[in-house]
């Protein structure tokens, strides 16, 4: 008998577009762990918790418009930030990661007035998919004191750690599920003349036209 021909694996990834503005869409990476009701394909939005202070939450309808802010060199070396304009007149609200009290690995995402955390970015080549980094992002069911203890879905981020025996720990708290935040192209908001925000360094970002239309099981390896 002749040799068995090895099956050639042809990489297949979803087509991306380019836009300065984008929404962030929640992709629940393990559907069996999803909340009830599901938050898959929900949009990232802000949760007001004080003057110019916001947690990052989710909503069923298109949420905040984001853009990557930085020079070409800053984008290349992961020193850019992700910003969403807010308030009147518009000011930049930067996406930041604030370490949780008592934790070395879990941070809470914030969208406060200011520049945001450098290194929060949309993935680039050679990574074949587009998603927000650094991973792993989480969606967590948390009570917020600002709302008298009411529960909200809050976005957090956890660092992956490796144990002495080589085991990998994704450090996902019990009240959280792992998610990816996927950029969906949208038109960047225009700014009025009195805006404190600026789009001078709003970068072209690779994003998907319609995240909810993507069947992720069709892509790979």
Curated annotation (Swiss-Prot):
It holds the Pfam family DUF7907. GO terms for biological process: aerial mycelium formation. The keyword Cytoplasm applies. Glycans are attached at residues 27, 69, 141, 215. Keywords: Allergen, Cytoplasm, Glycoprotein, Secreted. Signal peptide: none annotated. GO terms for cellular component: cytoplasm; extracellular region; spore wall. Expressed in the mycelium (at protein level). Its main location: secreted. It is found in: Secreted; Spore; Spore wall; Cytoplasm. This is Antigenic protein SchS34. It comes from Stachybotrys chartarum (Toxic black mold).
